[in-house]
Amino acid sequence: MPELPEVETTRRGLAPHLQGRRVHGVILRRADLRWPIPPEVAELLPGQRIEDIRRRAKYLLLDTAIGSAVLHLGMSGSLRVLPGDTPLRAHDHVDISLDNGRLLRFNDPRRFGSLLWQPAGEVHPLLQGLGPEPLDDAFDGDYLFARSRGRSAPVKTFLMDQAVVVGVGNIYAAESLFKAGISPLREAGKISRERYQRLADAVKEILGYAITRGGTTLRDFISPDGAPGYFEQELLVYGRDGLPCPNCGRALKHATIGQRASVWCSHCQR
């Protein structure tokens, strides 16, 4: 599933092609995505100028004066800006045509993505109750320490809770905990403020670097220009169970934590 760096890579790739453009029309070939596409998307979006394209957590918002189209890539979704006469491929579910003859095409083989509508001045229910962005100043060791008090869940589960912090999925949680030297099994409420500061710093560093590398291509993610993400080539623990730890050489451990595959070094991470 695309995580924060992949979604941010998508946003940055789309922004120069969408900002300031006016929507000419919307074609919905399949409306039965993870949630049905509401009729407001096709009824209200045509004629509107795209003022901005923003990211909140793993959602992309195409802002107009009357509201925002809210997009989620799901497990396998992709967004591409293409010439208006580009032939259809399998799973091309939505076209948003623009005033310059080009179009924004949403392709989603597994149909776990979504396209929703948020009226101006409102916050869509899916965006309510979300934690801070991990790259914002509000996300630091003090914040994590305060939020973790009384929490008995493993720290990896805690870190992946979208109400705690958004956009830190399985890949980047594993890599951040490794860099911070914290076992993913450690009880969240028993980690010191100092160790949480190391973890917050690791999350910021790893996510920031992954964005510069275009995200991680494991199965389905391709950026808007068709390029894969290259951070996969630099993963230190994720997907490497049984292989030597890059720090100490001991075999990396594997377990299921919170129903997610987890890999770590039991020697370097305590």
From Swiss-Prot:
UniProt signal peptide: none
Co-factor remark: Binds 1 zinc ion per subunit.
Cofactor(s) listed: Zn(2+)
Zn finger spans (FPG-type): 236-270
CDD domains, alphabetized: EcFpg-like_N
Record-listed E.C. numbers: 3.2.2.23, 4.2.99.18
Keywords: DNA damage, DNA repair, DNA-binding, Glycosidase, Hydrolase, Lyase, Metal-binding, Multifunctional enzyme, Zinc, Zinc-finger
Binding site for DNA: 91, 110, 151
SUPFAM superfamilies: Glucocorticoid receptor-like (DNA-binding domain), N-terminal domain of MutM-like DNA repair proteins, S13-like H2TH domain
GO biological process, one term: base-excision repair
Gene3D superfamilies: 1.10.8.50, MutM-like, N-terminal (3.20.190.10)
Pfam family, one: H2TH
Active site: 2 (schiff-base intermediate with dna), 3 (proton donor), 58 (proton donor), 260 (proton donor)
Catalytic activity: Hydrolysis of DNA containing ring-opened 7-methylguanine residues, releasing 2,6-diamino-4-hydroxy-5-(N-methyl)formamidopyrimidine; 2'-deoxyribonucleotide-(2'-deoxyribose 5'-phosphate)-2'-deoxyribonucleotide-DNA = a 3'-end 2'-deoxyribonucleotide-(2,3-dehydro-2,3-deoxyribose 5'-phosphate)-DNA + a 5'-end 5'-phospho-2'-deoxyribonucleoside-DNA + H(+)
A single MF term (Gene Ontology): 8-oxo-7,8-dihydroguanine DNA N-glycosylase activity
Subunit structure: Monomer.
Similarity field: Belongs to the FPG family.
Function text: Involved in base excision repair of DNA damaged by oxidation or by mutagenic agents. Acts as a DNA glycosylase that recognizes and removes damaged bases. Has a preference for oxidized purines, such as 7,8-dihydro-8-oxoguanine (8-oxoG). Has AP (apurinic/apyrimidinic) lyase activity and introduces nicks in the DNA strand. Cleaves the DNA backbone by beta-delta elimination to generate a single-strand break at the site of the removed base with both 3'- and 5'-phosphates.
Name assigned to this protein: Formamidopyrimidine-DNA glycosylase
Natural source organism: Stenotrophomonas maltophilia (strain K279a)
